[in-house]
């Protein structure tokens, strides 16, 4: 369960870099790594769908899995400049929340998460 909580606290999103803001919307998938509160690391795979809410605000829904757990979470992001986005995520199953940043560069993005005593980083590609 500790792995599931860590995934829940970390598996969703990151910071964008060189695509237009409109290019954040859509489906993305990729791999990354989670550092658990115990200090252990696990590889994870995530599928994320971003939707524009208003202007420069987005919502996201992600499903991420490691060899030991699978979790779903939601997020809210705000464009903070260029192709950089920041926001927060929440996993209702484990009641875990945290901060996240996304940087988009063309058809790829880097996502960083911090919450629930764990950190994660993912590289996602547009599907």
Predicted segment positions?
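Bacterial N-terminal signal peptides that target proteins for export
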Residues: 1-6
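C-terminal segment of classical bacterial N-terminal signal peptides
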Residues: 9-18
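Central antiparallel beta-sheet cores of small beta-barrel/beta-sandwich binding domains
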Residues: 22-127
């Amino acid at each position: 369960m500790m792995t599931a909580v860590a995934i829940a606290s970390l598996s969703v999103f990151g910071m964008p870099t060189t695509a237009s803001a409109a290019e954040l919307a859509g489906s993305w998938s990729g791999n990354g790594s989670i550092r658990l509160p115990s200090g252990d690391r696990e590889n994870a795979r995530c599928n994320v769908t971003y939707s524009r809410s208003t202007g420069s605000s987005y919502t996201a829904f992600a499903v991420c899995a490691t060899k030991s757990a699978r979790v779903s979470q939601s997020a809210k992001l705000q464009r903070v400049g260029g192709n950089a986005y920041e926001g927060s995520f929440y996993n209702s199953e484990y009641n875990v929340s945290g901060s996240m940043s996304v940087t988009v560069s063309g058809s790829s993005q880097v996502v960083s998460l911090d919450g629930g005593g764990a950190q994660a980083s993912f590289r996602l590609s547009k599907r």
